[in-house]
Design a protein with these regions (language model features):
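Conserved N-terminal beta1-alpha1 strand-loop-helix module at the mouth
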Residues: 1-80
Length: 80
């Protein structure tokens, strides 16, 4: 059995992004992707996506955007 060395784990979704963290004209989903990209480039081990109160289409779109920014990192994506 493989064991993982996971030291950093972040759970979040667009609903966790506060207005003060948004760039001008940025959506909460875009800000989340930006944060995940930054954190994963700095060594984040796991990001757990929680996406409440939204359509399946929006969820899939956001998950795909996050997968794209995680491609060249060692960060794992967990979906809840």
């Amino acid at each position: 059995m493989n064991s993982f060395k996971l030291n950093t784990y972040v759970i979040g979704g667009p609903e966790n992004i506060q207005e003060r963290h948004l760039l001008p004209y940025e959506t909460k989903s875009a800000a989340l992707v930006r944060f995940v990209s930054l954190f994963s480039s700095l060594g984040l081990d796991v990001f757990q996506l929680r996406f409440k109160n939204s359509s399946d289409t929006d969820f899939i779109k956001l998950a795909n955007e996050i997968v794209q920014v995680l491609k060249n990192t060692s960060c794992k994506l967990c979906i809840n």
